[in-house]
Amino acid sequence: ANSFNNSIAIDTEATGLQIPERDKLSLIQICDEKGNIFVIQPNKDNYKAPNLVSVLENEKITKIGHFLRFDKSALEFFLKCKIKNIFDTKIASKIVRTYTDSHGLKNLVQEFCNKSLDKRQGSSDWNKDINELTDKQIEYAANDVVYLHKIKGELEKMLIRENRIDIFNKCLTFLDTRIALDQSGFKFDIFEH
């Protein structure tokens, strides 16, 4: 926990998108500010990970993710923790990149890092033992976190420049409520007419 300074990029892989109803948390990927990547397979018997939980709950460390609505929900549900101090690149992109409707991680990596992400391994059996995952699967999982620090930096500059940082921060505050709605079965937009 002491090796992480100001921020980490986080992502998860799961057996599907129905958490907590059906699916399980399979992998957790972390990238520190220096580009060191950690791919962690939680103990599926009890999901106890006290060192990881202490990092996730540390308010001094910003947790950067893309569509944290899913990852934060899965991590908090399975690890029984409360993740503090987040930056969601998907929310930031939707608020500040109004010149496009393309807000996927692949699009952000292309625009800000000039790299092409291969998303073909996305639908994989992530629940098998980590030693049975292919190099391509591990590379896919790692690529979901390796670019997030740079993307955050670029989006944050844009949010400040366009005077949208306050509304972005309000969205991050609301995310806990959105996750609670999801976990209570209200996956639709409750504000819709």
Name each region found by the language model:
Residues 54, 77, 94, 107, ...:
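Charged/polar, solvent-exposed surface patches and flexible loops
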Residues 173-193:
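Long, charged alpha-helical interface segments
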Residues 103-117:
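A polyampholytic, Gly/Pro-enriched intrinsically disordered region
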Residues 1-107:
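Conserved RNase H-like, two-metal-ion catalytic cores of nucleic-acid enzymes
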Residues 61, 113-115, 164:
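Short aromatic/hydrophobic-glycine micro-motifs
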